């Protein structure tokens, strides 16, 4: 019998030996040795119902069998005739067959592999063995089911997509962020080889061929410079930093960064040396950090020869780190990878001085190696006209304090001519992401996977940066949550609208507010020697050149936007990571194609997730069409806007189906591309069998009514101001600009009735009466929130009057603008008295603080600390290979006037940013897609009613708090020795009226 038992025990392999490890224990751990016998599990079941074991369970039944067998064991120790010793197989098995767990702990701590025990249990009969075997097999099934329930389930989707697709896109995203420059350099190397072998250069686009022609000599010159640095023959201060990247990557970064600046330089084809050097130096340092890390973590056999003498333990540690990084990369644990990169990179930051020195030297080498040759229309017997592509010159700029000179890099006119075709060949960093951004966890933890990402754009303001870093993370949770919500909104390209844009652009622009792709021809020089004619000609030439510069700048801007659109158009969707300015307003980190941009950007972007229109969605689409069509239609009641769209159904269908071949009704809109996108969406819905079930991807906008004044009216509980900016219900939206224009007209009519002999403004009033409308005063009313000055208002109104050409004499035009500006500001003060008093109070408090040489600080309702960055700038001179550069650095002295004038608008912007973020969080909790553009909130057509309810509730919640009282208290706590003015008097406006106002946002 015992031989049979032994045979049973040894004839089977132990199964499920890994079960214990899966649950956190190994059979060699200390916990394992202290486990209690199996019957403890059955005892547990009576006190721990979570285990799901009853007295009739398999565990209980087998426990009774085991107790029977244990009795045999005990008997064997007393009765040596049984032939079992304490060291026998059965004894050892008896000791191993255990389950651990604390009595009453509420959870199963460890499950031993019962298959292995079953194969070793002894019995007094074969029937016992068979019965136990059956029980064990049954129990193993229960064990597997229990383990499955205990193990954490892997998510089936991440970011709304399958795990496999997500991981694939994430790998692509990592490649985009870490290998962009390397891929560009590789492309140039391959093009050079192709050109040598197959003569492909003539087939390349113009700017691509220029880049290719500059690349090889620039790369070789950088390599030669690096060799001098290595040999110690170059004693330049930049030498230690010059060889940290391969020459080909430095060449590509230098070309692309400089050309990018030239493209965005206002159409002049020039870039300031200090700006260009800083941009190039920063890009080189960042890429060097990634390159250095990747080199460090290579396998030991790939390390360079100077590591042969490295001690073995260091080599092992490096190999360990490399393997760890590799595993983490496979698991997509990018946060841990970034942390390791930071820990392993023991290099100190280069510092601004060294950055600009490296940048200047690279620019200098590019200037020495990059040449351009005009097209082959020169005479055969003339030497070829080969000239430098870039030159370094000095520009003089006249300022109020005198003239200033600064160095610029100027490109040749032939290079400038090709700039607006360059975007498609540029490496554009901070592209929209293919996967949801990393959640924000700290000042520099979130958004992009590898690219440096900071939650706030501090622009070198140290105090603001430190203030954000010092705040407990818990305090910033609402801010993190709001930014994550904005970043997780998935977008895609509207390919139909993009196709129309491409057709218009390919045919020369000039439609739908797209700039003409051709320059205005310069006027011919007159033959006459008349000085007046020559002066007139020069004036015309100057105007044409200015116009062409503006066109060039707009062309570059459109090309950059379209370059991004073309790269992203085949993607199912993409995301815009967001961060904040110092006031707490949220912005997409990608700068070119985003929903904060122009009508072009907004027209070709849509939500990647579609939703059925539902009962209200089609109505909101019609309202949205009227809003983007504009021309006064957007000021009608909702019913009026719906009627406008329904009256233009034929135009809508024609625009959607034949946008360029038909009547082109959509081109008459103020926002033509958004109008076209809406026409297409409405046409699709109306053509479908059931419009309510038609899927819409279009974001519908709800915009505040002069939102800054809405916030001031709420702060001051101003009844009159609240009515002017739609905080109270009305039959149609109140138009604050028309309201101010009406007041201005009343004042001017009173003045016009006076005796001109006693008041010089009488004639000006009579002249301007017919010119007063909402357009004349709109910009001044809008900027009143930002503390517009009398001079600012005068210049704004002067521009409007000059456009109309009513007053030709410059002196009279200036005088009329002065009078109109004073009148407009008077009307504003009358209508928004509470806003004016709050602005004055905020400015007075700021002045008191700034006079003590302290910046103004406050904390937004969402817990974000704000420090105004306005300090006097000091000059710091750096000698570089190009020129002596003047770097500006903050001093300890604050700018009192700027601190005072900027505080009121900055404070209100921090409040509108808080309102937007509160709305974003609430929309996410309600399952809505949400995008925000400061005072414009977007969601699907079917969800507009719900979003409207949320944004009103959040506005009331925001201003139910004692905001001004809290601000004054924080000032008094920070500066107990200073005397602050009392809070301004406020009105009796009931905030809850906002909840019933249909046009608060509309």
Swiss-Prot record:
Pfam families linked: RNA_pol, RPOL_N
Gene Ontology annotations of biological process type: mitochondrial transcription
Localization annotation: Mitochondrion
Taxonomic source organism: Nicotiana sylvestris (Wood tobacco)
Entry protein name: DNA-directed RNA polymerase 1, mitochondrial
Chief location bin: mitochondrion
Active site: 703, 778, 935
Tissues expressed in: The highest levels of expression are detected in the mature leaves. The level of expression is lowest in the cotyledons.
InterPro entries assigned to the protein according to its UniProt record, in alphabetical order: DNA-dir_RNA_pol_helix_hairp_sf, DNA-dir_Rpol_C_phage-type, DNA-dir_Rpol_phage-type, DNA/RNA_pol_sf, RNA_POL_N_sf, RPOL_N
